[in-house]
Amino acid sequence: MSKIIAINAGSSSLKFQLFEMPSETVLTKGLVERIGLEDSIFTITVDGEKQKEITNIPDHAVAVNMLLKKLTENGIVKSLDEIGGIGHRVVHGGEKFADSVLITDEVLADIEELSDLAPLHNPANVVGIKAFQEVLPNVPAVAVFDTAFHQTMPESAFLYSLPYEYYEKFGIRKYGFHGTSHKYVTERAAELLGRPIESLSLLSCHLGNGASIAAVEGGKSIDTSMGFTPLAGVTMGTRSGNLDPALIPYIMEKTGQTVEEVVNVLNKKSGMLGLTGYSSDLRDIIAKEEEGDHRAKVALDVFVSRIHKYIGSYTARMKGVDAIIFTAGVGENSAIIRERVLEGLEYMGVYFDAKRNNVFGEEAFISFPHSPVKIIVIPTDEEVMIARDVLRLGDIG
């Protein structure tokens, strides 16, 4: 048995989960928020109880030291020698990484170089890796990339209709994201269906504040809705999703904003927040719609219609699907959104059961037994996928 810690480092946060492997038992999990501020928040679960502490955590190195101290103080590990491996979520692996990889100096340099493609995420991921290297230099560490699962996409899916040299010189292409989540739920769907994943065509709908759809054929991603960045695809909480690229200079001209300012609007002030004017949270928007708010209704209609576009095109691409999977915050917990997405899909063999659909955050088949296309709710577990890859690549006994 080995203890493996899964890490997701953000610019001012550090999310962690400690597993006993290979049993995949969660020993503890927690979150460090507001790193760099005087009122940082450290939360850890001990024996099922959440412990919360507000203190000054100036940087990620201090956060890591505090985390490791808490593990020993609370008896979760007797000593740090029990930690056999560390798994780091890294947002962007470019074309360089089609799988998770053991972190070396060369790999770390490559991840830093890829920061051009993910300036909001990769630098924070690197900070997290370095912080652990300082404290646990001899413990194997593995990088698990959000983009890796989608590296199986064919050129017809990942190339943009731009001058080919842009791809050759600058790496401009579709990369896709949420790969670890899409991989987990499609593998789990195959288990639940009792069929080899190689025989299945699956649609994975990762619907949260960020959202993406993936077409997975034979266990391999063949297309996905996010693109060069996580801004592309369906309408999201605060992100616009796909739009006419000529809108960017037009908005700049009309508003006097810079490129950076417009891109910031597209990332942080658009999507459901932009359409409603008051919230990115679908729970708030559904409540407002029930009160008769027109913009809430329109926003929800836009959200669902964009998902329909991908379901239709990916079903055509795979010549039919065996199952549609719902995962992430909205996908796992919103029966209303699932119902609206599935309504009217009988033409493609979807027959969902409204009673079975009344589930929240748990695995369930929500289609009728006779439905040719199965509908499955599967809570995602990116952390356990990270731990599995550490076990696979870290040579951990």
Curated annotation (Swiss-Prot):
Record's keyword annotation contains Nucleotide-binding: yes
Subcellular location: Cytoplasm
Sequence positions that bind ATP: K15, H206, L207, G208, N209, G210, D281, L282, R283, G329, V330, G331, E332, N333
Primary localization class, coarse: cytoplasm
GO molecular function: acetate kinase activity; ATP binding; magnesium ion binding
Active site: D146
EC number: 2.7.2.1
Kinase recorded as keyword: yes
Keyword annotations from UniProtKB, A to Z: ATP-binding, Cytoplasm, Kinase, Magnesium, Metal-binding, Nucleotide-binding, Transferase
Residues marked Transition state stabilizer (site): H178, R239
Family, as annotated: Belongs to the acetokinase family.
Function of the protein: Catalyzes the formation of acetyl phosphate from acetate and ATP. Can also catalyze the reverse reaction.
The protein's name: Acetate kinase
Species name: Bacillus cereus (strain ATCC 14579 / DSM 31 / CCUG 7414 / JCM 2152 / NBRC 15305 / NCIMB 9373 / NCTC 2599 / NRRL B-3711)
Gene transcribed to yield this protein: ackA
